[in-house]
Amino acid sequence: MNKLMLQDLHNNLKRRIISHGGKPIEVENGMSERFSHKQDTVIKSWLWDVPGFRRWRVTRMDAGDKLQVLNSVAYPAYTNDKPILGIDILWFGLKRKLVAVLDFQPLVQEERYFCRYYKDLQILKNRFVDFNSQKTMKIYDSNKYFSPWVLLYNGSFDDLQCSLAKILDEFLHAYWQVDNNNSREYIKIIPSKVEQLHINYDIYSAERDPAHGLFKSYFGQTWADQFVREFLFPHSHLTAD
């Protein structure tokens, strides 16, 4: 794996978004691109207007052989209570270490919600055994905004037996299929409650995002604070339920 391979993953994600009607929109307040003040590093971010979603963001960080990052979070419209899509891929080139986290991030931890939205992710979890890492994400409460079937790889890239590109492609396909998992017994969460759950998610994530320290080391604290609060989790300034 190298910089070009991670860029290919980004390009595949972009094609998927466009194929579902996505159109790029302007990233404001100087958040679209930032060069490191002390290292040969750049971070770029994009926003997409995608039918059925209120916000879809993508970020790429390029620090050469030291580090490559691809991150994306997609928030469905408030009228849809399906999970938030989360993608986090980090490649530490000098160590040849890969950390990849792919999940349908649940708005609530309830059995009926899991039955409604997680059948396809469960199938992927069973198929791709490499993504059953037992290493936990210590910063986060895994029972809060991660599903029981989060796809997690944390280890040497050389030990990965399956194609990361294939996993990401099937993961995205599965996410777009969740609306087809109809259940007559399932009663959707009302839009006003979904909005509050999105706010809670942003507040929780902004307070615990481990990437903040990374951004701070490369781009300085002032910009890192602004990036996390205004671009990554813009609802974090609102009031939690």
UniProtKB/Swiss-Prot annotation:
<keyword id="KW-0560">Oxidoreductase</keyword>
<dbReference type="InterPro" id="IPR009249">
    <property type="entry name" value="Ferredoxin-dep_bilin_Rdtase"/>
</dbReference>
<dbReference type="GO" id="GO:0050617">
    <property type="term" value="F:15,16-dihydrobiliverdin:ferredoxin oxidoreductase activity"/>
</dbReference>
<dbReference type="GO" id="GO:0010024">
    <property type="term" value="P:phytochromobilin biosynthetic process"/>
</dbReference>
<comment type="similarity">
    <text>Belongs to the HY2 family.</text>
</comment>
<dbReference type="GO" id="GO:0050897">
    <property type="term" value="F:cobalt ion binding"/>
</dbReference>
<comment type="function">
    <text>Catalyzes the two-electron reduction of biliverdin IX-alpha at the C15 methine bridge.</text>
</comment>
<protein>
    <recommendedName>
        <fullName>15,16-dihydrobiliverdin:ferredoxin oxidoreductase</fullName>
        <ecNumber>1.3.7.2</ecNumber>
    </recommendedName>
</protein>
<dbReference type="InterPro" id="IPR023658">
    <property type="entry name" value="DiHydbiliverdin_OxRdtase"/>
</dbReference>
<dbReference type="Pfam" id="PF05996">
    <property type="entry name" value="Fe_bilin_red"/>
</dbReference>
